[in-house]
């Protein structure tokens, strides 16, 4: 069960169906002791391995919610192997449904807490395409701490202006907190609008550029 094949009762059914072998021998008794480090365990002829914790880097696409279940939309768990779903993985933090980029899925609650705890001030870097021209004055406002329209004060953040045209900007934003729709609201406070948002990093994790959207 700890290998992600299902619940204990589901594994018992697999054993009865003679679909599991240990060191080349069919096992039907769930009480048989095995050592996952030395014994070869096969399910339908494929080797399975015991992993206490699972870590999955995903390039989340738009249109998918960062949740374990949702009645209206496809979730990020719908994009991964069901085997990992059975191991209890969950998304670490949330990306808006129309935001894409780096998302970590794991069943390591301690790591998730370290990455998400406000006390840890883990830096996250986003790249945004903005309708409107972001200015050095906007960067200064970010550095001082943007005040949102509802009066919420944001921690000081870093705004790097990568390029601008007459009516559009490409920027990178470095945040150490994660308020609801924060990047969009901070840019809105400067009188501009985010039209595309991608997360590039989360602490030491950097999005693997070889991952296609949804991988």
Set out the residue ranges of the language-model regions:
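Basic, flexible Lys/Arg- and Gly-enriched helix-loop patches that mediate nucleic-acid binding at interfaces
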Residues: 1-215
């Amino acid at each position: 069960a700890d290998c992600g094949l299902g619940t204990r009762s589901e594994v018992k059914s697999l054993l009865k169906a003679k679909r599991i072998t240990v060191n080349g021998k069919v096992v039907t008794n769930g009480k048989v002791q095995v050592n996952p480090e030395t014994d070869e365990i096969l399910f339908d002829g494929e080797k399975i391995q015991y992993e206490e914790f699972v870590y999955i880097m995903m390039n989340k696409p738009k249109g998918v919610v960062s949740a374990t279940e949702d009645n209206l939309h496809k979730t990020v768990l719908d994009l991964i192997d069901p085997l990992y779903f059975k191991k209890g993985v969950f998304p670490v933090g949330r990306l808006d449904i129309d935001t894409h980029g780096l998302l970590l899925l794991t069943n390591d609650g301690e790591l998730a807490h370290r990455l998400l705890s406000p006390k840890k001030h883990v830096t996250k870097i986003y790249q945004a395409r903005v309708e409107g021209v972001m200015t050095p004055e906007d960067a200064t406002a970010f550095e001082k701490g943007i005040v949102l329209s509802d009066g919420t004060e944001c921690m000081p953040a870093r705004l790097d202006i990568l390029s601008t045209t007459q009516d559009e900007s490409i920027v990178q934003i470095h945040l150490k907190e994660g308020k609801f729709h924060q990047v969009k609201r901070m840019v809105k406070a400067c009188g501009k609008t985010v039209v595309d948002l991608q997360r590039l990093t989360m602490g030491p994790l950097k999005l693997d550029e070889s991952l296609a959207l949804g991988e």
